From Swiss-Prot:
Keyword Secreted assigned: yes
Expression tissues: Expressed by the skin glands.
This protein's name: Probradykinin-2
GO MF term set: toxin activity
Keywords noted in UniProt: Amphibian defense peptide, G-protein coupled receptor impairing toxin, Hydroxylation, Secreted, Signal, Toxin, Vasoactive, Vasodilator
InterPro entries the UniProt entry points to: Frog_antimicrobial_propeptide (IPR004275)
Lineage: Eukaryota, Metazoa, Chordata, Craniata, Vertebrata
Organism: Pithecopus azureus
Keyword flag Transferase: no
Coiled coil: none
């Protein structure tokens, strides 16, 4: 009986450790994806900055 308890605890412990490692990796990939999205949004904002009043891309003579 003692052998079964030890084996069961060992299996549960190893499963818990592997689960926590997977969750940590998942969290890291989500953070990287969020950082990429933030960079893309900031690049879009830079492209579409408001034009100052009175500005025209055409030459005025």
């Amino acid at each position: 009986m003692s052998f079964l308890k030890k084996s069961l605890f060992l299996v549960l412990f190893l499963g818990l450790v592997s689960f926590s490692i997977c969750e940590e990796e998942k969290r890291e990939t989500e953070e990287e994806e969020n950082e990429d999205e933030i960079e893309e949004q900031s690049e879009e904002k830079k492209r579409f900055e408001p034009v100052p009043p009175g500005f025209t891309p055409f030459r005025q003579t």
